[in-house]
Every structure is written in C-alpha cells, then in structure tokens.
Amino acid sequence: MNQKLLHTANPFADPGDGTGAYNVYKVMYDAVAEGLTEEDYSTTDWEGCKGMINNGQIACMVLGSWAVPQMKEAGDNADDIAYMPFPITLTSGKQAASVGPDYSFGINASTTEDNQAAALCFVKFMTEESGFSYDCGGLPVAIKDTRLPDFYAAFKGIDFVVDEPAIEGEEDL
C-alpha cells in the first residue's frame, strides 16, 4: 500500500466496497461528526487521558500497541483495557493490521571495533533477552521469540501486514 499510494490517481476516493483509505478515514470522520470525540482533539491531555480511559470516561482511542501498557498502569481497571484491530476489511475479505517498527537500534560504523562489539552485545541483549518489545506491547523482534502480549488475543485470524520500504528514489516523497 505505501508503495502504491503515491502512484494512485485518487487514493482517498471511496472504492464503494467498504475498503481502502477512504473508509478508514470515514470511520474517524463519522465519529467526529456524531459528537463521539472530545470537542478539541488537537489539545488532548495525554497524561490525563490515560487515567480517563482506565476509569471509563473515554470509551475508545485509536493508538498503537505501545500505548496499552501505559493505559493499563494509569488506574485500577487494567482488566478493562483491551486492544483490537481497526474495524476495516480488505477486498480479499480478510482483516489485516498494519505493523511497523518503533524505535530502531544502530551501531556507529565510525567508532572503534571494541565499541562496535559492545554495541552489538547491547543490541542482541535488547532484542533477544531483555523482553523489551514484549513489555512495551510490541510484536516479537527476535526470530525465536513468538510470545505476544495477552492483549493481542483479538488479533487471532488477523493478517499482520508490514509496510514495504519506499521505492528507491521516492524515500522523501
């Protein structure tokens, strides 16, 4: 999708079948039009909203999995916090969820070999042993790690779709 969007004549047009970018944005548009969102969503108090969703003052938020642990820790109702795929279906009839990386680790190619070796040990520890991705609500990073946080239960049968890298020469479009 991310490689085709730039080359689509009208990428946000309604395809008429309940799929595509138009219908993702239509869900959000309808929620605002029907008064189901806060009056000024551009000035949301991030810290305050975590407690508000935890105690039931906010019903739903469109966020990534990284936010789930924060919402659970923001009050006494952690069991009330859940995570679900965005309710849109592909033309294939399947439901999918877009996945992508959070922060990335890098090793400075200009530093000493000793520093590079130490950095590699740190990256291996973070990705293979620390549980960082799991604890933050992410998908496994290491090939051997198949654990998913419990809140991914709603994703059973959902295809995870990873964005393709930008086409060479179009990285900054």
Language model segments and positions:
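Periplasmic solute-binding protein
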Residues: 1-8, 25, 29, 94-109
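Glycine-centered hinge/linker elements that transmit conformational signals in sensory
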Residues: 7-42
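Solvent-exposed, polar/charged alpha-helical surfaces in well-ordered, non-transmembrane soluble domains
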Residues: 22, 26, 30, 51, ...
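Acidic/polar loop patches that form or flank catalytic/metal-binding clefts of enzymes
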Residues: 34-41, 61, 79-83, 132-136
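Short helix-initiation/N-cap motifs at beta->coil->alpha
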Residues: 40-54
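Alpha-to-beta junction loops
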Residues: 54-63
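C-terminal lobe and pocket-closing loops
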Residues: 67-77, 90-173
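A structural supersecondary motif
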Residues: 81-91
